C-alpha cells in the first residue's frame, strides 16, 4: 500500500499531505493506511466524513483510474468488514477519546471534523428555541412586504426568521436572496418592541461590499421611522473582523467566554464558510442572538475543509414538522404541502427555506437551461450545447493550437468597446463599467488554460495589435487600461480581496489604478503604494464567486483536474447574466458533469 500511495501522489490522484497523514496513522496496516489517505484527501474536497459504503463500493479517492483501483483491491482481502477492522486499530475510536480518526454511525471522520460537526448539530438541537411573537402584528408586516397573492418562498423565509432563532435560506443566482435580506431586516426591526442590534457579515471583503450596498437601499426610508432607523447596521464586516480572528494563531477574540453583543447576526455567502469557522461563529454568540445564514449550496464550497452548508441542506427535502408548518401557515396565510416531517432531524429541516423561483433568468434563458441541465444530468440538453443550440451560449472546442489561438483572438474582440472608451477619454466610471460587462474565467491558476498564461497570451495579442504600449515602473510592466485585481483586503486603501480596478494616468501624470465603489464614486490609488494584486483579464472561478457579468467566457483545462467538478462548472456558468462562451474539450466538459463526484453520501 505504501508504494501504491506514493504512486498516487506522483499521478496527482492524492496530495503529498494525504500520503504523509496515512503514514503517520498506520505504517503497516494496509486498510487503515488507505482509509486515512482517503479521509484526508476527500476532506480537502469539502467532505466532512466518508460513509463505510464509500469503502465497500471501492470509491477510493473518487478516482476514475480503474487500473489504480484494481491494484488497491489486490492488496486488500477479498471480503472486509470495514467497521470491525477499523475499530481494531488504536488510531480509530468512537469519539469517546481523542483519536486521529473517528468511526461514528457508519461514517469515518478526522477527529477535528467529528468534534466540530457534533458541536454544531448539538447547538442546532439545543439552542434553536421558537420565538414568542405577536402573530397579528407579524402577519401584517409580512402582508405589507409581500402584497402579491401567489405563494412566495421569500415570504416563507422571512416568516422563518421571525419564528426561529436559527434560519438557513438557500437559493441559486437570481432567486432573490438580496431582496430577502432587505425584507428580513425590515421585518425584524418592525416586529421588535425595542431597538435591536443587527450585524451583517460575509466571508470575504467583496461579499461585504455587496451587503453594504443593501444597507444603502432607499427602501428603508419607505418603511422606517427615524427611531427605527437606529436599528439599521451601519456597515457590514468580514467574519474574521467580526470575530476578531488573529492571522497567525487563528484564535478568536470573541468566543463562548466573550460573546458578541448582538440581537441578530446575518451571514451571507455561507457556502464559503467551512465547518471549523461555523463552529467558531456559533460559539461566539449568546443564546439569545438570532442567526440567519444565506447562500447557495450548489456553488463552490469553502477553500478550507468541510462544507457544512451542504451537510445541512441534505435535510432540506425532509419538509417541516407539523408544529412548524402550522406556525408558517398562520403567519403567511399560505396552505403548505402536507408533507409532514416526523424524523428526529426535523430540528434542522424546520430551519431551512429553499428559494425556488428565479427572478433573474426566465425558463427560456440559456444560462438557466444549462445550469439546470448540469445538476439534473440531462444529457440531451447538455449535448445540444455542442452544436450551439442553447440560447446565448456558445461552445468552442480547444483541441488544437489553432483553436487555442482563435480563443485568444475571440476573447480580445470582446474588449473593443472598453478600448474605444479609453481612446475617447470617457469617464473613469464608464470605462470601468465597460470592463465589468465582460469577464474571462478560468478553473486553474497554472497551465496553458490557467489564468497566469491566459493573461499573458491576451496581453501578447493586444501588444501585437498595438492596443497596449508597455512602460516600466520599478521593473514591473504597466500599460494604460491594465486591469488589476486585489488579492488581499487593505482597509487603509479601502480595497477588498477580489476588487478589480483599471490602470490610468491622472491629470498630474501619476500612474494610478481606479476602483468603482458601491456608491458610484471612484477610489484612485497610485501604483507606487499598491500591494498584493494580479493582472485580471482572466480570473479564477473561485475569485468570481459572488460577482455577476453580462457576458462571460469560461475556460476549462485540457485535462481532468480534481478542482474541475460540477460545482466549479455551475459557479462559472451562473456568473453570467446573459451571454456565455465556453472554451473546452467536449470529453472534458461531459466528464466534469457525469464523473462520480456525488458517490460520497451524507
Swiss-Prot record:
Enzyme Commission designation: 5.6.2.3
SUPFAM superfamilies, alphabetized: P-loop containing nucleoside triphosphate hydrolases
Cross-referenced Pfam families: AAA_19 (PF13245), RecD_N (PF21185), UvrD_C_2 (PF13538)
Domain of life: Bacteria
CDD domains from the UniProt entry: DEXSc_RecD-like, SF1_C_RecD
UniProt keyword Metal-binding, yes or no: no
Residues reported in the UniProt entry to bind ATP: 171-178
Keywords: ATP-binding, DNA damage, DNA repair, DNA-binding, Exonuclease, Helicase, Hydrolase, Isomerase, Nuclease, Nucleotide-binding
InterPro entries referenced in this protein's UniProt entry, alphabetically: AAA+_ATPase (IPR003593), Coronavir_polyprotein_1ab (IPR050534), P-loop_NTPase (IPR027417), RecD (IPR006344), RecD_N (IPR049550), RecD_N_sf (IPR041851), UvrD-like_helicase_C (IPR027785)
GO BP terms, alphabetized: double-strand break repair via homologous recombination
Catalysed transformations (reactions): Couples ATP hydrolysis with the unwinding of duplex DNA at the replication fork by translocating in the 5'-3' direction. This creates two antiparallel DNA single strands (ssDNA). The leading ssDNA polymer is the template for DNA polymerase III holoenzyme which synthesizes a continuous strand; ATP + H2O = ADP + phosphate + H(+)
HAMAP family linked to this entry: RecD (MF_01487)
Oligomer and partners: Heterotrimer of RecB, RecC and RecD. All subunits contribute to DNA-binding.
Protein name per its UniProtKB record: RecBCD enzyme subunit RecD
Species assigned in the record: Buchnera aphidicola subsp. Acyrthosiphon pisum (strain APS)
Amino acid at each position: 500500500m505504501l508504494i501504491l500511495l506514493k504512486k498516487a501522489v506522483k499521478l496527482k490522484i492524492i496530495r503529498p499531505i494525504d500520503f504523509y497523514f496515512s503514514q503517520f496513522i498506520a505504517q503497516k496496516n494496509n486498510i487503515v493506511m488507505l482509509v486515512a489517505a482517503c479521509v484526508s484527501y476527500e476532506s480537502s474536497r469539502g467532505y466532512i466524513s466518508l460513509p463505510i459504503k464509500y469503502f465497500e463500493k471501492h470509491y477510493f479517492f473518487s478516482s476514475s483510474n480503474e487500473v489504480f483501483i484494481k491494484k488497491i483491491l489486490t492488496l486488500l482481502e477479498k471480503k472486509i468488514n470495514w467497521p470491525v477492522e477499523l475499530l481494531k486499530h488504536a488510531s480509530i475510536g468512537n469519539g469517546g477519546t481523542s483519536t486521529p480518526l473517528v468511526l461514528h454511525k457508519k461514517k469515518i471522520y478526522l477527529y477535528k471534523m467529528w468534534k466540530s460537526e457534533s458541536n454544531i448539530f448539538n447547538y442546532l438541537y439545543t439552542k434553536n428555541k421558537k420565538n414568542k411573537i405577536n402573530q397579528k402584528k407579524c402577519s401584517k408586516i409580512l402582508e405589507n412586504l409581500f402584497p402579491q397573492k401567489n405563494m412566495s418562498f421569500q415570504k416563507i423565509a422571512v416568516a422563518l426568521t421571525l419564528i426561529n432563532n436559527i434560519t438557513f435560506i438557500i437559493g441559486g443566482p437570481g432567486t432573490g436572496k438580496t431582496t430577502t435580506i432587505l425584507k428580513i431586516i425590515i421585518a425584524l426591526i418592525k416586529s421588535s418592541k425595542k431597538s435591536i442590534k443587527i450585524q451583517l457579515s460575509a466571508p470575504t471583503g467583496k461579499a461585504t461590499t455587496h451587503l453594504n450596498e443593501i444597507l444603502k437601499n432607499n427602501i428603508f426610508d419607505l418603511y422606517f421611522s427615524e427611531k427605527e432607523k437606529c436599528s439599521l447596521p451601519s456597515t457590514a464586516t468580514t467574519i474574521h473582523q467580526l470575530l476578531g480572528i488573529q492571522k497567525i494563531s487563528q484564535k478568536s477574540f470573541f468566543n463562548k467566554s466573550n460573546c458578541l453583543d448582538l440581537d441578530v447576526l446575518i451571514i451571507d455567502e455561507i457556502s464559503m464558510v467551512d465547518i471549523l469557522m461555523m463552529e467558531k461563529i456559533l460559539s461566539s454568540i449568546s443564546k439569545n442572538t438570532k442567526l440567519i445564514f444565506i447562500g447557495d449550496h450548489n456553488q463552490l464550497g469553502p477553500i478550507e475543509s468541510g462544507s457544512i452548508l451542504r451537510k445541512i441542506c441534505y435535510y432540506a427535502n425532509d419538509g417541516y414538522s407539523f408544529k412548524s408548518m402550522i406556525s408558517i401557515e398562520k403567519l403567511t396565510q399560505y396552505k403548505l404541502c402536507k408533507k409532514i416531517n416526523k424524523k428526529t432531524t426535523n430540528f434542522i429541516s424546520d430551519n431551512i427555506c429553499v428559494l425556488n423561483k428565479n427572478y433573474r433568468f426566465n425558463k427560456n434563458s440559456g444560462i438557466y437551461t444549462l445550469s439546470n441541465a448540469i445538476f439534473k444530468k440531462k444529457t440531451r440538453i447538455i449535448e445540444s450545447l455542442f452544436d450551439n443550440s442553447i440560447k446565448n451560449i456558445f461552445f468552442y472546442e480547444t483541441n488544437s493550437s489553432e483553436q487555442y489561438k482563435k480563443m485568444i483572438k475571440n476573447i480580445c474582440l470582446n474588449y473593443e468597446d472598453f478600448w474605444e472608451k479609453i481612446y475617447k477619454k470617457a469617464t473613469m466610471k464608464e470605462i470601468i463599467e465597460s470592463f465589468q460587462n465582460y469577464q474571462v474565467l478560468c478553473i486553474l491558476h497554472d497551465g496553458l488554460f490557467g489564468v497566469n498564461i491566459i493573461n499573458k497570451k491576451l496581453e501578447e495579442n493586444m501588444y501585437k495589435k498595438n492596443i497596449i504600449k508597455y512602460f516600466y515602473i520599478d521593473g514591473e510592466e504597466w500599460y494604460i487600461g491594465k486591469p488589476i485585481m486585489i488579492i488581499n483586503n487593505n482597509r487603509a486603501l479601502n480595497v477588498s480581496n477580489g476588487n478589480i480596478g483599471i490602470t490610468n494616468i491622472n491629470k498630474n501624470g501619476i500612474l494610478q489604478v481606479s476602483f468603482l465603489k458601491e456608491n458610484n464614486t471612484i477610489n484612485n490609488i497610485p501604483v507606487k503604494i499598491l500591494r498584493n494584486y494580479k493582472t485580471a483579464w482572466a480570473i479564477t472561478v473561485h475569485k468570481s464567486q459572488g460577482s455577476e457579468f453580462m457576458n462571460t467566457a469560461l475556460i476549462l483545462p485540457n485535462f481532468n483536474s480534481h478542482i474541475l467538478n460540477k460545482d466549479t462548472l455551475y459557479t462559472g456558468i451562473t456568473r453570467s447574466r446573459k451571454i456565455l462562451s465556453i472554451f473546452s474539450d467536449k470529453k472534458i466538459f461531459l466528464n466534469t458533469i457525469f464523473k462520480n463526484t456525488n458517490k460520497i453520501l451524507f
